[in-house]
């Protein structure tokens, strides 16, 4: 291959690579139908959008200002969660929204437990960015933790 052909080939390859990055879809979750008042669970919509974007090579879920109630978010490769200032991903206080149990590691020990708030297995190139808030609603989880401790102490 002469120098002219090599340069032409490399130029075309560079253009194709650049176009694939430019084509990555960005989905506005409010426009996609998500409830922004924090009253309705958005888990199914968020996870199905992630699945669809992943099937097409990746993309961004954009959350404009609002409150998005959700259970466990299942991240896949080449997905970005972008939270605008004023956007809150508010994770459910209903423990059933984090079932079925999955295998997780806690202090070096593998075990079955609730799905994490944001969960990924065999995924790469995952990004969470923006000035928004991730609200894990920790009080509900800590209340349950201490209830179980008291139950174990009192009942063995």
Positions of predicted regions on the chain:
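Bacterial Sec-dependent N-terminal signal peptides
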Residues: 1-27
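Extracellular/periplasmic carbohydrate-active domains that bind, remodel
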Residues: 17, 21-156
